[in-house]
Amino acid sequence: MNRLRNLLPAGIAAGALVTGMALAAPAATAAQTASGRANVVTALDYNSTGWTYRQVPLTTQVPDFADRGFDDSGWPLGQAGFGTTNGTCSWNNENTVKTPWAVDTDILVRHWIHLPRDAQQVRIQGTVDNDAQVYFNGHLVQSVKSGKCAAGAIDVVVPVADLDCCNLIAVRGHDGGVATYLNLRVTYVKPTNAF
């Protein structure tokens, strides 16, 4: 019995410590949620599958390829990243290039993205070697001239007026010679529910 009395205060202290730790954990999670980090959702990730694509000569125009009603059913399906594996940039290797894109051509890529109606701050990010025109639901949202081996040049928040539940991202990648690369992702912020 004496032994039990000696252990009782230690048990209470340990219980208080565990309770304190448990109460502190939700506070850290709430702070992370308030900062928005926990609410960023990836709608389309790097190296994603399901892209339709077509390589064209540099000067070839493909009218309306970025429009939602454009028929790409005859185009092949591919996986991002698109590019060459013999270039001088760190991403021009067999681990990051999933679909070939020939040097001295342009590549047209399209992918459908479903977003919830409450999606906010829809953001397109990625890398292109050399240049790109980025479209969202047929609207040009960014023109990029990134040059050789400049990572992260594609970075744009889509205007709210361009958003819908079923969305189309389309990109025309342009090559300036030596090597090619195109890979991107789409994220959005999911609003937190008020309690």
Put a short name on every predicted segment.
Residues A14, A27-S90, H111-H114, T127, ...:
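Accessory carbohydrate-binding/adhesion or oligomerization-edge regions at the termini
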Residues M1-A31:
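Secretory targeting and sorting signals
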Residues D131-V141:
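Short, surface-exposed beta-strand/strand-loop-strand elements in extracellular ectodomains
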Residues A119, T127-A132:
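Short proline/glycine-enriched turn/loop motifs at strand-loop junctions of beta-rich domains
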Residues D104-I107, L115-R123:
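Extended extracellular/luminal ectodomain segments enriched in beta-structured repeat modules
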Residues D129-D131, G147-C149, D175-G177:
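Solvent-exposed loop/turn segments at secondary-structure junctions
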Residues W91-I107, S143-A150:
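Extracellular beta-rich ligand/substrate-recognition surface
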Residues V144-D162:
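Short histidine
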